[in-house]
């Protein structure tokens, strides 16, 4: 079992133990969903399985998707349109207002999330999107 599957397994187990209605999944754009293009013109070359898996996650009632990006607002609008073309929607962008600060945790500058999908978190987009798709399809089959 690879790292991303372990992270989802752990998050879903905690969800059940704690009685939460959903988990929060933070997702980066560059070098995670799309291959980074260091030019002014974006190429929108997605990693294999990325868009298909994100569409599945969009439909999953137990997952709240948070887009995590440093993209400028005008470029972000282009990305959101591109995601919409693939029927992918993010519930939040760069934040999570559903989880307030507590006595122990301050979420003013770092949003609360259960699983992070980012190449800088160790996510391997060349392999992990496919593994994640099969994992999530298995969960959906169990719910039937």
Explain the meaning of each model-derived region.
Residues 1-144:
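HAD-like aspartate-dependent phosphatase fold
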């Amino acid at each position: 079992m690879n790292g991303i599957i372990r992270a989802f397994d752990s998050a879903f187990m905690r969800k059940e133990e704690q009685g939460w209605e959903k988990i929060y999944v933070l997702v980066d754009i560059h070098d995670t969903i799309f291959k980074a293009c260091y030019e002014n013109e974006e190429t929108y070359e997605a990693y294999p399985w990325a868009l298909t898996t994100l569409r599945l996650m969009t439909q999953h009632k137990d997952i709240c998707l948070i887009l995590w990006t440093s993209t400028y607002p005008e470029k972000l609008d282009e990305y959101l349109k591109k995601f919409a073309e693939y029927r992918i929607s993010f519930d939040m962008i760069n934040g999570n207002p559903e989880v307030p600060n507590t006595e122990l945790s301050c979420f003013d500058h770092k949003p609360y999330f259960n699983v992070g999908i980012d190449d800088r978190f160790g996510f391997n987009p060349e392999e992990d999107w496919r593994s994640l798709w099969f994992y999530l399809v298995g969960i959906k089959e169990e719910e039937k």
